[in-house]
């Protein structure tokens, strides 16, 4: 039976460590400030933004909320980002995605100053990661590395397979695993004989947005399975890209949905905010 990797518990440990670091900064008269921008009122985005504000309050980070109407123009949004770039009291800027269709997401992400890009999405941040330089790392992949390390799961020399090649998870994940000396394969919708590839994995990371796609026949005995998916099953119940009930008896360790990768993403966002000030 698989060991359950408890993302809630590990993310709480990280937030508690950050709380101490923020308190130490405050003693020196330094305040950590995160600006969060939401355009429109996408219900999922509102929940995510609320969770981020809650985490900020817990850790001791000051959060500035900019809730803009759906009809905000691209120019108005870019102007706000530029203003926050120039504001020395703001350490991190986060624009909640997705943005309304009339706004070019790439343009907005590129406008965020790399030294305030706590989401790690700016092309400069991505470039730094790919050549092994210091910079902000996308929060979900960074959180997965922490889940593995804090669960004493060895990455060095291990066969690591990622299903999904998104810019937010798959690609940065591959870079971080390489940094830890994992042997990395990325699979996607054009991969031939997917099961043959995934069965080689000591560590399998699944991020494709397909409900319960990975079943026991995709993994080898004792594999570590990290489920990044956030889907709903036919009964409307929250689940992931992995059929947990089917995979769990065969896996060595597995992340649940909810309570696995999700909480880590926000913990690492807080980590990026605090690091931006300390450095």
What do these predicted ranges mean?
Residues 32-40:
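Short beta-strand segments enriched in small/hydrophobic residues
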Residues 76-88:
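Short, well-structured alpha-helical segments in soluble
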Residues 56-70, 184-186:
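Short beta-strand elements in bilobed, periplasmic/extracellular small-molecule ligand-binding domains
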Residues 41-53, 135-224, 228, 233, ...:
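Glycine-rich phosphate/diphosphate-binding loop of Rossmann-like nucleotide-binding domains
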Residues 94-155:
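Anion-binding alpha/beta catalytic cores of soluble intermediary-metabolism enzymes, centered on
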Residues 106-122, 126, 229-279:
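Rossmann-fold NAD(P)-binding glycine/threonine-rich loop
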Residues 38, 94-98, 163, 207, ...:
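Short beta-strand segments
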Residues 1-30:
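Positively charged, low-complexity intrinsically disordered leader regions
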